A protein has these predicted regions:
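N-terminal targeting signals for export/organelle localization
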Residues: 1-48, 185
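A short beta-strand-turn-helix
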Residues: 40, 50-69, 141
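Short loop/turn microsegments at loop-to-beta-strand junctions
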Residues: 46-47, 69, 148-150
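Conserved redox-active cysteine motifs that mediate thiol-disulfide chemistry
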Residues: 65, 73-90
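Structural microenvironment flanking redox-active thiols in thiol-disulfide oxidoreductases
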Residues: 82-123, 134-140
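Thiol/disulfide oxidoreductase modules built on the thioredoxin-like
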Residues: 121-126, 132-180
Length: 185
């Protein structure tokens, strides 16, 4: 009986040590996750990417250096996105669309062009939309399976200055104010 107990105890210690080592390996190999499941934070240089736009052109983030850039991750199946997009159109895009120092790109996640076009027509969006059909660009900024809507504001040096999640009126107002202030500089 005593031998059986000691054998079980030794096996348990071995298993626990192995599990701890495996857990440490996973933690060391994983990305750091910040608030709202972002894997980037304010102050980070925004990860570069190139995506095809709905009009057939391409958009490369690093080519926008020197400009204030807002990325909006969205999708037609996202109710919060549908509620937020008219506000982005009215309060951000319309006042700044002619400003050569400002870039706004909606990034539609996991939808085809055939799905995106009716969606943007329904919500009345006229700002440019890029297609992230596999959510690969989204996964550079947040955990791949985390939710949207998300807005990322990037300064002229390519650094992230603001991250939003969901559509909250006070946070959206702060985003509009931040964009206006950055463009006034």
């Amino acid at each position: 009986m005593k031998k059986t107990f000691l054998s079980i105890l030794a096996f348990g210690m071995l298993f626990t040590t192995g599990a701890k080592a495996q857990s440490d390996k996973v933690a060391n190999d994983s990305v750091t996750v910040y608030e709202h499941e972002y894997i980037v934070k304010v102050g980070d240089v925004a990860p570069d990417f190139t995506l095809q736009m709905t009009d057939g052109t391409t958009f490369t983030l690093s080519e926008q250096r020197g400009k204030v850039v807002m990325l909006q991750f969205t999708a037609g199946w996202c109710g919060i996105c549908r509620a937020e997009m008219p506000h982005i159109e009215r309060d951000i895009w319309q006042p700044h669309k002619e400003n050569k120092d400002f870039v706004l790109v909606g990034i539609d996640r996991e939808e085809t062009l055939e799905e995106i076009l009716p969606f943007i027509e329904q919500v009345g969006t006229t700002y440019p939309i890029a297609m992230d059909t596999n959510a690969d660009v989204f996964a550079m900024y947040a955990l791949r399976n985390s939710g949207i809507t998300r807005n990322i504001l990037i300064d002229r040096d390519g650094k992230i200055v603001m991250l939003t999640r969901k559509f909250k009126e006070d946070e959206f107002a702060a985003l509009v104010e931040k964009i206006n202030a950055m463009l006034a500089e």
